[in-house]
A protein has these predicted regions:
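Long amphipathic alpha-helical tracts in eukaryotic proteins
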Residues: 1-163
Length: 163
């Protein structure tokens, strides 16, 4: 991955954001892939929140193309590392869309969704909502992909953890 800082300095997130509404799936997933790289540093996550990127990414979770869903979920996962990102995703009703992706046929979609949900479970309101979807997360612990099964176990521990 190239250094994202020069891209952030020239406002790449804001410049790429409008392209997320393109009609061509190849454009959307490639833009989302670039946005993931830009949201790795903390400053990129903050910029994404400040410009309302979550609002444009959540609808992509329902896209027909698996790469669009995969990369949209990865960007949301990256943004949800920070508290502001968690609440932006919760406010845009992203939690329910991510839960629905736990049953997706594409392993990368399931993995990114469960990792994003794990981060949302760190917020009290996210944890509360995820308790209602614990069965879906528990089912994923039996996934044939060991990485996904392990991520689901981590999500379940995070959701059910009590202080």
């Amino acid at each position: 991955m190239a250094d994202p800082v020069p891209g952030l300095e020239c406002r790449a997130i804001e410049r790429l954001q409008p392209s997320l509404t393109a009609e061509v799936a190849d454009v959307k997933w490639r833009i989302a892939r670039c946005l993931y790289d830009l949201t790795v540093p903390h400053s990129g996550k903050r910029t994404a929140c400040d410009c309302g990127l979550v609002k444009d990414l959540v609808p992509l979770l329902a896209d027909d193309h698996h790469l669009v869903k995969t990369h949209a979920a990865s960007v949301l996962m990256s943004i949800a590392v920070i508290t502001e990102g968690k609440y932006a995703l919760l406010n845009e009703e992203g939690l329910d869309k991510l839960v629905s992706l736990l049953a997706d046929t594409t392993p990368a979609v399931r993995l990114n969704a469960v990792k994003a949900l794990t981060l949302l479970a760190e917020a009290p309101s996210g944890k509360e909502k995820l308790m209602k979807s614990l069965n879906e997360v528990t089912e994923l612990e039996g996934d044939s992909d060991d990485v996904i099964a392990k991520a689901a176990a981590t999500a379940k521990k995070t959701i059910t953890w009590l202080p």
